[in-house]
Amino acid sequence: MAVELTSIKLNPENHLLLDQPLLRVPHELARRNFKSVQRIVEREKDYVLPALKETANASLSGSKNPTETIEALDAMITRMQGLKRKMEVLHEEEKKIATQSQKRIQYIQDLYKIPSLADVKYEQWSRTRLNRLLADHMLRSGYLESAKQLAEDKGIADLVDLSVFAQCQRIAHSLRRGETKEALQWCGENKVALKKIQNRLEFELRLQQYIEVLRVGDKAEARQHAKKFLTPHSETQSHDIQRAAGLLAYPPDTRAEPYMSMYSLERWKHLSDLFIRTHHDLLSLSSRPLLQIALSAGLSALKTPSCHSAIASSRASPLSLSTSICPICSTELNELARHVPYAHHTKSSVENDPVVLPNRRVYGMDRLSDMSKKAGVPEGKVKDPITGEIFDVSEVKKVYIS
């Protein structure tokens, strides 16, 4: 008995599998913001408290005159005013993250209030998620302004990580241009997290700086750079450090491997891709766009072996009776669905009069005869609705399902 749509109960847990980064990203951003506050306060405290104590003692002992004491106090006041400005900026960032988290939690809670798939609220919620997935795909593809416009038009700016992907794209593009400054600054801000996961991004960036110094022929500077930035990684990156040392003996136009590859400008693309992977790992972002993951799940539910057969239904002849409305067979989705698994069917629907054609395709005889008649095939002949081949009825053999 068919189950009506109104009786299909919604399972929020299944729907939220795609939405895990929704709360993880603001949580990670809040943690980073707190660490920044902690680091700045500790640095200023380590400077101001000893300086204040020293100034007070000097003033009491008379080793400093009043003018020098006032100058020292003014310097400390200026420093504290700078601290206040930094704290205000970080506080605004914290408020922004808190607002984002609140909106995202509300968005998730709304799903738990929807009783079934037939509820009109589910359609509204799904439309919002689709817009989110589209914006996510645009951001990952580099269409930042389009994603921003979509988010603003649909009122989902707090549900989309615009600033996160904007920063990621900016740094990735700087690496493709041959610049390491922004990427190294990012590594410095995330030094503890990178060390925890034993990521080699910073080492690769320093190695690239070493290569660029050698490219201009400054071997003395290259040795100093290696001693300062590469040697500290000797325990974990000894093999690459040895290869880097070998570069001293080879010019940039060498054809010898692995040095030719190390000098190659393609390394900048490798660094850009490595940065994006590292950035996404730290923020618990998936390596693939969420839209692609969602599509893959849906495509798998629809995919059958005939969708990627040698004879594609979408390319069949005009006389073919095959349909071209299958999403898997469409030009847009066919390649994306190529590597997803087939649908898992626990029950099969088999015609009660199956026959096999000479090309080994199986159909129901009544349905095959009816379609052949509609296609104008001469009497005593049948036509394969997929390939368009025509066979004599005597060539058709009955199939017995055991």
Swiss-Prot record:
Residue stretches in coiled coil: none
Pfam families tied to this protein: CTLH
UniProt keyword list: Cytoplasm, Metal-binding, Nucleus, Zinc, Zinc-finger
Domain LisH, chain residue ranges per copy: 126-158
InterPro entries linked: CRA_dom (IPR013144), CTLH/CRA (IPR024964), CTLH_C (IPR006595), Fyv10_fam (IPR045098), LisH (IPR006594), ZF_RING_GID (IPR044063)
Main localization of the protein described in the UniProt heading: cytoplasm
Zinc finger residue ranges, RING-Gid-type: 326-387
GO cellular component: cytoplasm; GID complex; nucleus
Subcellular compartments: Cytoplasm; Nucleus
Keyword Secreted annotated: no
Domain of life from the UniProt record: Eukaryota
Single annotated GO MF: ubiquitin protein ligase activity
CTLH domain sequence ranges: 164-221
Assigned protein family: Belongs to the FYV10 family.
Purpose: Involved in the proteasome-dependent degradation of fructose-1,6-bisphosphatase.
Name of the protein in question: Protein FYV10
Organism from which the protein derives: Coccidioides immitis (strain RS)
Upper classification of the organism: Eukaryota, Fungi, Dikarya, Ascomycota, Pezizomycotina
